[in-house]
Amino acid sequence: MGIPAAFRWLSTKYPKIISPVIEDQPITMPDGTVIPVDATKPNPNGEEFDNLYLDMNGIVHPCSHPEDRPAPKDEEEMMVEVFKYTDRVVNMVRPRKLLMIAVDGVAPRAKMNQQRSRRFRAAREAMEKEEDKQKFVELLKKQNGKPQEEEPVEVVVKKAFDSNSITPGTPFMDILAASLRYWCSYKLNTDPAWANIKVIISDATVPGEGEHKIMEFVRSQRGSPNHDPNTRHVIYGLDADLIMLGLATHEPHFRVLREDVFAQDSRPRLCKICGQKGHDAMNCKGEAKEKNGEFDEKDAVVPLKPFIWLHVSILREYLAIELDVPGLPFQFNLERAIDDWVFMCFFVGNDFLPHLPALEIRENGIDTLTAIWKDNLPVMGGYLTKDGHADLERVQYIMAGLAKQEDAIFRRRKETEDRREAGFKRRKLADEARQRRAQGSRQIRQAAENSGPPAGFSFHKINEFPGKAPQPSITHDMVVNRQAVDQANVANKSAASVLKDQIKSMMAQGTSTPENGAESTETPAETAAAAPATEEQAAPPAALGKRKAELIEDAVAGPEASSTEVTEISESDAEPTDSVRLWEEGYADRYYEQKFKVDRKDIDFRHKVGRAYAEGLAWVLEYYFQGCPSWEWFYPYHYAPFAADFVDLGKMEIKFEKGRISRPFEQLMSVLPAASRHAIPEVFHSLMLEETSEIRHFYPDDFEIDLNGKKMAWQGVALLPFIDMPRLLAAMETKSHLLSPEDHLRNAPGKDYLLLSDSHPTLYDHITSQFYSKKQGTTKFELDPTKSAGLSGLVEKIDGYVPHGSLVYPLSRNSMPDVDYDRSLMVHYFFPDCSHTHKSMLLRGVQMPTPALTRSDIDILKGKASRSGRSYGGVPLSNKNYSGRNEPINYGPGGGQQGGRGRGGYQGGGGRGGGRGGYGGNGGGYQANGGGYYNGGNNGGGGGGYGGQPRDSYGPPPGWQPPPPPGLAGFGVGPPPPPPGAAYGGAPGGAGYGGYGSSRGGYQDNRYALPPPPPQAYQAQGQQYGQGGSRGGYQGQGNQYRGPPRQDRGYDNRGGYRGGGYRGGGDNRGYR
């Protein structure tokens, strides 16, 4: 999913959702014999699982181009690695009923745009790396003065596997599909743990993304009346959207399995250039490979990377607490609330839309949206979503609430970045100062040693400073960063001359320079090596790149370019300029003018973009909950709108047409650059390369990457032209007749496979009796769930397939054995037809897992939930907003009006009819039409409400006295000392006092007394009659008396001392 860092954010916020996987390992005997894991034994994790789903792209990618070991030499080695990895995952989970393997097939058009961006970037990065390697080899030859040995040169220039080949329609995907079918059949023949399980393989010829094909299967089984609601599911994959998909199934027994990518890896990192240990690509010298031992033995076995569980059931527990909104005018439904939360996560990032500018996962953007949702849920009258369909009129409330915070979010983001950058620069300057002092001291001592001591003096011998340093070695990092630091090098040369003068001055009396003329034998490369390593690790990406460039340039330039002076690169050279400047006024005009190339006054265009984005949100929601609503829809812009540009969403009518599913070659031509054309049939190459081709501009050799306010290129936006699909199809049609029969076969849509062993107690006989008995019936029939262990769907006979034949390994080198008597069975499989809508509900008969959260966990989470989303990601509700205006922040349309009972105080400024007074407290006041006396001491009494005749729904407390007459609503100067805790509501038609209630157990008892009257000079000010919530007093909405500046403001009609006065805090919590 397109939410970077989403998994880490979730696991940090909800720590109990993560637990380590307990894994049995194969046993190696002294004679070298390996005893495999016995997966028939009980699962060591203490729970048995029914179904395991593998999103295979998360396995194929790390196996084909690993980071911790040399890449496989060819496709056959890759397949063997895929077999090993998959076997390890299956042995961890030990599914007892079903294994489903899903490979990405043709994707919806909305996904193709993201794939196009990734693949063009990958091709350009591969080309740049290859060019860097070539330059690196040439420099090595020049430095050594002789031709480099053949082996390292071949290793350096060796081309890596093109990961763009992992795309539907390529020969590689054909090899993968055949290999997976072989391996699963082999395991069904040889592994007892596979005897009773069913295997479904959905390869790249079947349209749809792997994880969404898996979810379609789960939804189809839930719709069957024979489905077990307590089925225990595990899905393996690296994408964060698997968590959202798991929640969307509403299956409580669901886990996500993945590698613990944050665990410390004890395996040595290999250089990506030469493949050797001991250094990285930045410090590669291209030296010949050293033998490991006498016979170049392989390394000893290193610990495998651990795996972790993510428990969706425990995440549901956390969300049940965090999303709870008491006092709703309708019944709270946890399943609907979870759907809303998943929907709001799409605002922060997904694979189909650019994320909204104001929302970042690292800034707790999801918490910000959750706070807005909780505040508006009573007003909206219901949930944002229902069974995967969005209510856009209610979505408008969320966007309006976010729009009120956008200015604050952008400004606070800038402040945070500035503080972080300033802190890094301070640390950098301090480190450089330490290095200069140490270098200057070494240079002085060396100069004195080289010139010889004066007569009568002797020095202690210093062994650690040699007379002459070796020539600095050229490294890969010097080459790739040379261009970025040319300007700094020029500046450093002038600083070097200053250093020379200083050294000559210190050596003037009775000293002479060495014969070789070198004032210092300390090389800049050594100076760079003395820099602490922790700085590089802790530095932000932009600053890290700048620091590396400076150190590299010093090493390349030689001793003359080193300097003891601080030579800073100008800001324009250090990092790109953000011309939009979201933190400054007018950012919206600049944004649309620069990003969309439209007139800044064209407001209608902004609303058009907002409507297109809202349509995209509706598409994504339905895609996750019901399946792909349209294969042809896509978002037609590179950038997202602002929240303020979502206008009149409730008037939109969205209806998607299913559309046409692209064929594999059409997707290849849509997403691959010309550099990866080897994966595309040769007949189409001319369309990508020839200038006369009408679609040549779809495949630019170079393209712009807009950093869009980010620091690193990979975070930017690739400005590639969108594919005009009708033109592409028309161009391809002119070449399609030249395709070979094998190509036509690869371009055709495929079917899923169902595999099982002949030892399955019922299903094997159930299928063979229909397809391969003397009484053969139809070639396609519906499975009986009582005989298939609950599996619903249809199966079809494969033409030409005969059971109990031989199983042949499909690749050439026979890395795996053939099986003469194949005991497995293979048929085509089709999901059961689900014409009805998948309901967001728990199924009847489900038994919920044992709760994992303790009372302490719940209390802590409730405390955090009350503040969550109201700090960094948005404006705290208890404070003024960033512009200093006292107005609602998180509320959408309607402000403080909530069904005729405004919240008063900060949230709505009083509303109609005495609302709750100040924020956070059930303020002391009568509601309109006598809605009762509120407890005046709960988190501080709010301002008393006007209007209405009181009823005796709640009687006033003993000893209660009526409030003073109108006109005594506030003070304009400093308040008198507070009396004992009192809480008063307004009389009919009168301006009430805010309560002097307790603040979290502070100043409260059962005595009630009037506050002292204000000075006579101010009694006439601030009178305000009317219905409900007039503010009166200082800063009142009536006769607005503005008291002397910089004085305490007394009662700011927002409840008690501290209601904007005594402490000037405005948090309405009473005197404390």
Swiss-Prot record:
Keyword Zinc-finger found: yes
**E.C. number(s) listed in UniProt:** 3.1.13.-
State the function annotated in the UniProt record.
Possesses 5'->3' exoribonuclease activity. Required for the processing of nuclear mRNA and rRNA precursors. May promote the termination of transcription by RNA polymerase II. Essential for vegetative cell growth and chromosome segregation.
Task: Name the gene.
Answer: exr-1
Q: Subunit info?
A: Interacts with rai1; the interaction is direct, stabilizes exr-1 protein structure and may stimulate its exoribonuclease activity. The interaction also stimulates rai1 pyrophosphohydrolase activity, probably by recruiting it to mRNA substrates.
Cellular localization per UniProt: Nucleus
Renumbered residue ranges of the record's region Disordered? 414-459, 509-577, 865-911, 943-1072
User: What keyword terms does UniProt attach to this protein?
Assistant: Coiled coil, Exonuclease, Hydrolase, Metal-binding, mRNA processing, Nuclease, Nucleus, rRNA processing, Transcription, Transcription regulation, Transcription termination, Zinc, Zinc-finger
Instruction: Indicate what this protein is called per its UniProt record.
Output: 5'-3' exoribonuclease 2
Record field: compositional bias (Basic and acidic residues): 414-435
Upper taxonomic classification of the species? Eukaryota, Fungi, Dikarya, Ascomycota, Pezizomycotina
Show the ranges annotated as biased composition (Gly residues). 892-911, 983-1000, 1025-1036, 1056-1072
Biased composition of type Low complexity is found at 518-543
Which coarse location class applies to the principal site listed for this UniProt protein? nucleus
Which one of the record's GO molecular function terms can you name?
A: zinc ion binding
Q: Which organism is it from?
A: Neurospora crassa (strain ATCC 24698 / 74-OR23-1A / CBS 708.71 / DSM 1257 / FGSC 987)
